[in-house]
Amino acid sequence: MARLYPFRALRYDPTRVNMTGVVTQPYDKITPAMQDAYYAASPYNLIRVILGKHNPTDTAAENVYTRAASTLNEWRAEGILKEESEPALYGYAQTYKVPGTEEIRERRGFIALGLLHDYADKVVYRHEQTFPKHKSDRLALFKATRAYCEQIYMLYSDPTFTAEKAIFESGAAPELEITDEYNVLHRVWKVTDPTLITRVLSAMDDKWLLIADGHHRYETSTTYMHERAAELGLDEAALSKNLSSRPELPSQNLSSRPERSAVERPAGEPAQLPAPAFPEAAMMMTFVNMDAPGITILPTHRVAFGLIGFNGREFATKAEHYFTVEEIHATPSGHYPGAENLLKHLNDTPGIAFIAATRDGDFLLTPKPEAIAPLLTNLSPRQQQLDVTQLHKVVLEKLLGLNEETIRAGQNIRYLREASDALQQLGSGNADVAFLIKPVTLAQMRDISLNLEVMPQKSTDFYPKLLSGLAMYTLD
């Protein structure tokens, strides 16, 4: 099952930089405006590595990927980035307010290397589809930089909370605290005590993993692993044996360090801890126990644009064949129903439902099971019961006439976390219709994943995101 490793992370030297100014959200959540803000925040902001700006004069020899590699090497040479003196795991806690509420939650996990597996091994499970374009971009970056600067968000199940107890019950103060632009507090603890590390690794031995965020990076890393294995002369049979058994692996010597961290190994002889058979066989991941409180999944709303001749009332009439359609009128005070009111209507409706907001009116759609059943026959019962599946298959494809390829390419669809942003695009004329949906539940995601099925793209939005720049894994 899952195999984890401590590692000597490459990290920013907090005496050389303001940490708040150098970390970022994950690359695929960074808008052009956010990219500009990160560039302005610090000359050492990680944006220059994970999502640098393209230049009109870029060539095969000089481009966004070669600049990322040069930047990373320069920062290492300057001492802006330093490699840890010994392998460690990193406790990682995020304290945040659930969007749209006053509820405060804390999500706890830990950063380590995780051995890469093909999905066929049934150790790591996915829940969303991926796209070749996004993977080719990340592969080019990984090859140029020879570093993994962002974590993959992994879920596992452990009702005994063994790993969390080993990492977080020491009572030690975090060595790093950062509050991000969403007012999320991120705290990090370094764990170097080999006894604690071994306890955590052992606790994960029998676990399977679900990818919460980072499908493209995970699959790209797996591709890179296979390429590197071929270069090393490992055929597929040997590689499969290496990844599925527990061979004698090279060990990392934990030499003493001049400074002490928050959670450290005691004085004594250097300890031996396992390492991957070769660097590309593992990827940096954050592991979060799905049995613990603190996990939040937000909905990802959709707006459709470029629909020639679209009329909201004609759409509602057409939708009545498949849905019970209820128009949501102005509030008693006469105000137009905004995002908060529309979401209240949606969330007060039991079962599967979504809002179709148009410039001609806003409509609550609840499915007629007998009518939609013929459109879902090629899907499993689990997939059929997802709001997002019914939205895609019945509304986007059947009623709007879009197809899977155009949806995947984003030719007529945008994805938005905030319902207010979706309505703003509608009001400004940048969208023809906004679809507000309910979030996928953790139980639904788990069932889909473990049955080797997938959801439509952008089905889950785990909040908050893992910060990029807290730790990095270098392959050289």
Describe each region flagged by the PLM:
Residues 1-242, 273-476:
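Surface-exposed, charge/polar-rich loops and edge strands
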Residues 241, 245, 249-252, 256-275:
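A cross-taxon signal for low-complexity, glycine/charged-rich
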